[in-house]
């Protein structure tokens, strides 16, 4: 299976540079795997397509303002992208860096607000280990000085509105450097209406990493090595999923991050055990889903691992037909774009 088989043409004007005025005002494409039909609606009406007894599984990760800017001792500008905090007493992070000239261990980067970053070592296969030191807790400093890490395809700097809109309303656990975008469409009022309809919710955590934006650098899909991301599933969520299955309800994954976490943590029979760890599951056509019965997701980049997961869930031909139809009808694509519900 070749990566180029997952390519498609998208006019630039269909890339959503900004979110819709209202979270739940996005369009919603409706796919039914059994009938092969394609329908259309608004996201705020998703309750009409869910059933009492269904369980929405949400990713409650919180996006950190992971983009930082500093200066080397020479005055050269450095851009830092936080990836993952290391499990050490010191405030050490694996990072990606961009600089006019190469970096080396031992260099000190000066940041705003009396914060410095020491370059500790080069990491393989890419990135750097930095140690941050300042007069106040790093987390407090970061919330004030960091910039929201918008996807590169938005081709614009982060603005004040992104602090709110590039974050789900149920975000709790800080650690992601990319939003679980399917969750951006939900409002507290919509979640309340779903609960009144008998649709339950449960949360897990997957801290989305920068690999979600990185292109596949291989020709064959099966040769790709996917990035790992930290996850956590509670005993309460595992129990809710088991009880939903026993009652005949559907487990509806909100986003590819929730779907990957559920499938990674499941055993051969679809059973789940609570726990934490690093998820590195790569789902592409041919994979048999063990837990997920329905999926809420956005429209994804060509040749991405995300469109491969959606193709595995609904069938590649069906998904690409839906994508072409969405482009023809002027749907908005990518992180701030419209959504689809696949059942």
Curated annotation (Swiss-Prot):
Function of the protein: Transfers and isomerizes the ribose moiety from AdoMet to the 7-aminomethyl group of 7-deazaguanine (preQ1-tRNA) to give epoxyqueuosine (oQ-tRNA).
Origin superkingdom: Bacteria
Keywords linked to the UniProt accession: Cytoplasm, Queuosine biosynthesis, S-adenosyl-L-methionine, Transferase
Database matches in Pfam families: Queuosine_synth (PF02547)
Protein location: Cytoplasm
Record-linked InterPro entries: QueA, QueA_dom1, QueA_dom2, QueA_sf
Molecular functions per Gene Ontology: S-adenosylmethionine:tRNA ribosyltransferase-isomerase activity
Cellular component GO terms held in the UniProt record: cytoplasm
Family: Belongs to the QueA family.
Subunit structure: Monomer.
Biological source species: Pelobacter propionicus (strain DSM 2379 / NBRC 103807 / OttBd1)
Metabolic or biological pathway, per its Swiss-Prot or TrEMBL entry: tRNA modification; tRNA-queuosine biosynthesis
Primary subcellular site in the record, as a coarse category: cytoplasm
UniProt cross-references to PANTHER family, sorted A to Z: S-ADENOSYLMETHIONINE:TRNA RIBOSYLTRANSFERASE-ISOMERASE
Name used for this protein in its record: S-adenosylmethionine:tRNA ribosyltransferase-isomerase
Keyword ATP-binding: no
EC category: transferase
Reactions the enzyme catalyzes: 7-aminomethyl-7-carbaguanosine(34) in tRNA + S-adenosyl-L-methionine = epoxyqueuosine(34) in tRNA + adenine + L-methionine + 2 H(+)
The keyword Transferase appears for this protein: yes
GO biological process: queuosine biosynthetic process; tRNA wobble guanine modification
EC number of this enzyme: 2.4.99.17
SUPFAM superfamilies: QueA-like
């Amino acid at each position: 299976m070749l990566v180029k088989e997952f390519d498609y043409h998208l006019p630039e004007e269909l890339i959503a540079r900004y979110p819709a005025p209202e979270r739940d005002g996005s369009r919603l494409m409706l796919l039914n795997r059994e009938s092969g039909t394609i329908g259309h609606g608004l996201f705020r009406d998703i309750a009409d397509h869910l059933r009492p007894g269904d369980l929405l599984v949400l990713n409650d990760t919180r996006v950190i303002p992971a983009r930082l800017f500093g200066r080397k001792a020479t005055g050269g500008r450095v851009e830092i992208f936080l990836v993952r905090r290391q499990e050490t007493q010191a405030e050490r992070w694996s990072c990606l860096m961009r600089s006019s000239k190469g970096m080396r261990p031992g260099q000190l980067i000066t940041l705003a607000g009396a914060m410095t970053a020491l370059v500790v070592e080069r990491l393989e296969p890419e990135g750097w280990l930095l140690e941050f030191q300042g007069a106040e807790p790093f987390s407090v400093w970061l919330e004030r000085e960091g910039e929201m890490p918008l996807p590169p395809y938005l081709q614009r700097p982060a603005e004040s509105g992104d602090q709110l809109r590039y974050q789900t309303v149920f975000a709790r656990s800080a650690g992601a450097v990319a939003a679980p975008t399917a969750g951006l469409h939900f409002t507290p009022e919509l979640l309340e209406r779903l609960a009144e309809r008998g649709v339950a919710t449960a949360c897990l955590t997957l801290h989305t990493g920068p690999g979600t934006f990185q292109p596949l650098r291989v020709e064959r899909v099966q040769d790709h090595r996917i990035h790992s991301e930290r996850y956590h599933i509670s005993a309460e969520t595992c129990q809710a999923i088991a009880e939903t299955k026993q009652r005949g309800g559907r487990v509806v994954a909100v986003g590819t991050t929730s779907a990957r976490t559920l499938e990674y943590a499941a055993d051969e029979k679809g059973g789940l055990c609570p726990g934490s760890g690093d998820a590195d599951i790569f789902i592409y056509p041919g994979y048999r889903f063990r837990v997920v019965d329905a999926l809420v997701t956005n429209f994804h980049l060509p040749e991405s691992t995300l469109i491969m997961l959606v193709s595995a869930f609904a069938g590649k031909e069906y998904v690409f037909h839906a994508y072409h139809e969405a482009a023809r009808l002027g749907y908005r694509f990518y992180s701030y774009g419209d959504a689809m519900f696949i059942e």
